[in-house]
C-alpha cells in the first residue's frame, strides 16, 4: 500500500515525521508524493501560530476531499494541532480516521491498522512521555544533512506560547540514544548534523544535573563521517 506523508511546521516536527516514515517503511509501506495514488494519507500538523493552524486546516480539508473522491482509504492527523484539538478534529472533519498526539507518534503503525479497520479514535500518551522508537529514521532532507532532535518540550510557560501545552515540559533525549541515532545517520551518508530543540543549550540538565551540550558535542565529533555540526 502507498502512503502520502505531509509534514508541516518546524524542524522538530520533521524529525517526528522521519521517525514515522521509518516505522512505516519497515512494515513494507511504499511512500508516494501523489495524492491520487495514495492509499493512506498522514498529515503531521503545526498550530504554533495562527497561520500555521490555518495551513494545517487547509491541508486536512484538501486531503479529506481526496479521501472522498480518490483512492485513499484512510486519513490520519498527527502533530501539534492533533494534540491541541484532538476530539474536535474527529468531530468536525468526519473524513479523519485517526488522531495522534505529539507523544503518541510512535503508535503510527497502530493508527494505520485501526484506520484501515474502520475505527475512528484519538491516540494520546502522557504529555511528558518521550517516544524513542528503535526503527531508523527515513531521512527526507536530501541525504547530506539531517536534524538531530536532542530534547523535547519546554519548562517556560510563557503566556504567549503554547509549546508546553502541546509538547510537554523540557526533557532531554539520553546521550547514548543520540549518539546511536547520529551513528545511524552517518551510515546513511549524512555529513552534517543540525541539533534542534526548544531550548538547545539546556540539554542534559534534567538528566545529568548539569547542562551537557558541550559533552554531547565532543562525543558527536568522534563519529566517523560527521564533518559539520550546527546548533
Which residues does each predicted region cover?
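Periplasmic OmpA-like peptidoglycan-binding domain that tethers envelope proteins to the cell wall
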Residues: 206-207
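Alpha-helix-loop-beta-strand connector modules within alpha/beta enzyme cores
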Residues: 210-228
Amino acid at each position: 500500500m502507498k502512503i502520502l506523508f505531509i509534514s508541516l511546521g518546524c524542524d522538530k516536527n520533521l524529525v517526528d515525521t522521519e521517525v514515522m516514515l521509518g516505522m512505516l517503511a519497515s512494515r513494507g509501506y511504499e511512500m508516494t508524493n501523489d495524492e491520487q495514488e495514495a492509499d493512506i494519507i498522514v498529515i503531521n500538523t503545526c498550530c504554533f501560530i495562527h497561520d500555521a493552524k490555518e495551513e494545517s486546516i487547509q491541508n486536512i480539508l484538501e486531503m479529506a476531499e481526496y479521501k472522498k473522491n480518490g483512492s485513499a482509504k484512510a486519513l490520519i492527523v498527527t502533530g501539534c494541532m492533533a494534540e491541541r484539538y484532538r476530539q474536535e478534529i474527529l468531530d468536525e472533519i468526519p473524513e479523519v480516521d485517526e488522531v495522534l498526539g505529539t507523544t503518541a507518534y510512535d503508535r503510527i503503525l497502530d493508527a494505520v491498522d485501526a484506520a484501515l479497520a474502520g475505527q475512528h479514535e484519538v491516540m494520546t500518551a502522557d504529555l511528558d512521555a518521550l517516544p524513542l522508537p528503535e526503527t531508523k529514521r527515513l531521512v527526507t532532507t536530501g541525504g547530506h544533512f539531517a536534524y538531530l532532535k536532542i530534547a523535547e518540550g519546554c519548562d517556560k510557560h510563557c503566556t504567549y506560547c503554547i509549546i508546553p501545552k502541546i509538547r510537554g515540559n523540557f526533557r532531554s533525549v539520553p546521550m547514548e540514544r543520540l549518539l546511536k541515532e547520529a551513528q545511524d545517520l552517518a551510515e546513511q551518508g549524512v555529513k552534517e548534523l543540525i541539533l534542534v530543540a526548544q531550548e538547545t543549550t539546556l540539554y542534559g540538565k534534567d538528566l545529568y544535573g548539569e547542562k551537557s551540550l558541550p559533552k554531547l558535542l565532543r562525543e558527536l565529533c568522534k563519529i566517523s563521517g560527521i564533518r559539520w555540526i550546527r546548533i
